[in-house]
């Protein structure tokens, strides 16, 4: 029990550290340098429109390359619908869906608790998958992909998106934002690719620590359950 408690404490500390760093390692609105910066980097960051550093993806799943219907989960990112909901929500025919490939991004415009402006996630878990055409897909071009993935985990993009999002029909819970407006949103990025990479790597290492602790906690809880069952047989 002590071991389990210590892993849970460490996990909470790492999660808290990540939340703090996501708020402080990207500049606040109207600023061009972050509150906390990695050693060895200086100078102001630059403002870019998303369309200048990315390319929209609109390829359809015409040849049924994939039948893995994905959904965006706040905790797990882009994940197989069957794995997440324990059932398939998408229609039987997914040929009209977008085909997303590993490393590409998707913006889910539906808002939920803690995600007032929807969520933007990168596909990391599978080689490909399909998404409803309600999603906006893109890939990083003139920016480090790991940097961008973690920038969109912060709330720094919310202000820009909220300025061009008119709420659509409430019953769908979807934000009414046109792709052209979405790609015109501005973000501040380090001028040097090296700094972008360093930030991306910092957060990847932190994610790995969090994931390994979550796995260890899960293993210990399973073991504890088994030991308790054995005791009462």
Regions found by a protein language model. Name each.
Residues 1-46, 192-233:
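Amphipathic alpha-helical segments with low aromatic content
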Residues 5, 88-94, 171, 193, ...:
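Short, solvent-exposed loop/turn positions at domain surfaces
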Residues 28-31, 128-130, 177-180, 200:
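Short, flexible turn/loop "capping" segments at secondary-structure junctions
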Residues 34-37, 133-136, 181-185, 206:
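Short amphipathic alpha-helical segments
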Residues 37-61:
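Non-catalytic DNA-recognition/assembly elements of restriction-modification systems
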Residues 54, 58-90:
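DNA target-recognition patches
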Residues 95-159, 166, 170-171, 178:
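A short beta-sheet element
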Residues 136-144, 175-197, 231-232:
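Proline-centric
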């Amino acid at each position: 029990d002590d071991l389990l408690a210590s892993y849970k404490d460490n996990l909470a500390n790492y999660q808290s550290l990540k939340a703090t760093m996501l708020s402080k390692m990207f500049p606040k609105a109207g600023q061009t340098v972050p509150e906390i910066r990695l050693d060895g980097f200086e100078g102001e960051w630059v403002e870019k429109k998303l369309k200048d550093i990315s390319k929209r993806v609109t390829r359809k799943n015409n040849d049924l390359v994939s039948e893995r219907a994905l959904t965006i989960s706040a905790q797990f990112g882009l994940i197989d619908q069957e794995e997440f909901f324990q059932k398939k929500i998408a229609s039987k025919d997914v040929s009209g869906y977008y085909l997303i490939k590993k490393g590409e991004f998707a913006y889910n415009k539906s808002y939920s608790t803690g995600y007032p402006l929807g969520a933007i996630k990168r596909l990391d878990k599978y080689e490909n998958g399909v998404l409803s055409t309600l999603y906006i897909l893109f890939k990083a071009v003139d920016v480090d992909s790991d940097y961008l993935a973690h920038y969109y985990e912060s709330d720094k993009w919310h202000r820009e998106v909220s300025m061009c999002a008119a709420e659509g029909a409430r019953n769908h819970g979807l934000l009414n934002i046109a792709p052209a407006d979405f790609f015109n949103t501005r973000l501040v990025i380090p001028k040097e690719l090296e700094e972008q990479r360093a930030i991306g790597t910092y957060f990847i290492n932190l994610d790995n620590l969090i994931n390994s602790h979550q796995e260890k906690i899960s293993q210990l809880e399973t073991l504890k359950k088994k030991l308790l069952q054995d005791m009462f047989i």
